[in-house]
Amino acid sequence: MKKLKGLFLSLLLWVYPLKSEPINEGAYILEEIGDVLRFLPIFVGTVSLAMRDYRGLGELAVGTLVTQGVIYGLKGAFSTAHKDGARVGFAKRPCCNSWRGMPSGHAGGAFSAAGFVYYRYGWKPALPVIALAILTDTSRVVAGQHTILQVTIGSLIAWGFAYLFTSRYKPKRWMLYPEISSDFKGSSRYGVGFSYQW
């Protein structure tokens, strides 16, 4: 546990000084990777669709849409509050004079997918998705678009809605499927197959 805390603290200390503008080509590439990974719910949804997990696909869609709605509502509220004279320094983007930095929408998108996979399919399939979501958060901080607090809040909002909207996946024990084949003479054969797992 101490090693994990030390690793986490080292990561924070490494990322925190880089919250200004990207300093090299690698930072720009990382920013572009984060821009793509914010669409993780689409990639995860495609996998759910391929598994014919339509309920899971619906839960992912609802969780992601609610997450993005709340995040963009908060961004607008903090921006309006700043215009009205409120002290909302935590909502300012590090890169520029924008007050729509809190919370991070990219982080919300990526962690919507990570939380969904965790609660729907379990922790083992969720590990790579969580790693990609953390990479998305890191890319936003390195690019100077968000602070660590902003990406953390966006991630927590997404994880919370994934918890609320996602149910555990229970594969069907039985399956009914069409069978289309040909026999040794070349004649087509059609049928219906049924399988049941004990």
From Swiss-Prot:
<keyword id="KW-1133">Transmembrane helix</keyword>
<keyword id="KW-0046">Antibiotic resistance</keyword>
<dbReference type="GO" id="GO:0009245">
    <property type="term" value="P:lipid A biosynthetic process"/>
</dbReference>
<keyword id="KW-0472">Membrane</keyword>
<dbReference type="GO" id="GO:0009103">
    <property type="term" value="P:lipopolysaccharide biosynthetic process"/>
</dbReference>
<keyword id="KW-0843">Virulence</keyword>
<feature type="transmembrane region" description="Helical">
    <location>
        <begin position="143"/>
        <end position="165"/>
    </location>
</feature>
<keyword id="KW-1003">Cell membrane</keyword>
<dbReference type="InterPro" id="IPR036938">
    <property type="entry name" value="P_Acid_Pase_2/haloperoxi_sf"/>
</dbReference>
<comment type="similarity">
    <text>Belongs to the lipid A LpxF 4'-phosphatase family.</text>
</comment>
<keyword id="KW-0441">Lipid A biosynthesis</keyword>
<protein>
    <recommendedName>
        <fullName>Lipid A 4'-phosphatase</fullName>
        <ecNumber>3.1.-.-</ecNumber>
    </recommendedName>
</protein>
<dbReference type="InterPro" id="IPR000326">
    <property type="entry name" value="P_Acid_Pase_2/haloperoxidase"/>
</dbReference>
<keyword id="KW-0444">Lipid biosynthesis</keyword>
<dbReference type="GO" id="GO:0141043">
    <property type="term" value="P:symbiont-mediated evasion of host innate immune response"/>
</dbReference>
<comment type="function">
    <text>Removes the 4'-phosphate group from tetra- and hexaacylated lipid A species, has no 1-phosphatase or Kdo hydrolase activity. Absence of the 4'-phosphate group renders the bacteria resistant to host-derived cationic antimicrobial peptides (CAMP), allowing it to camouflage itself from the host innate immune response, and plays a critical role in the long-term colonization of the host's stomach.</text>
</comment>
<dbReference type="Pfam" id="PF01569">
    <property type="entry name" value="PAP2"/>
</dbReference>
<dbReference type="GO" id="GO:0046677">
    <property type="term" value="P:response to antibiotic"/>
</dbReference>
<comment type="pathway">
    <text>Bacterial outer membrane biogenesis; LPS lipid A biosynthesis.</text>
</comment>
<dbReference type="GO" id="GO:0016791">
    <property type="term" value="F:phosphatase activity"/>
</dbReference>
<keyword id="KW-0443">Lipid metabolism</keyword>
<keyword id="KW-0812">Transmembrane</keyword>
<dbReference type="GO" id="GO:0005886">
    <property type="term" value="C:plasma membrane"/>
</dbReference>
<keyword id="KW-0448">Lipopolysaccharide biosynthesis</keyword>
<keyword id="KW-0378">Hydrolase</keyword>
<keyword id="KW-0997">Cell inner membrane</keyword>
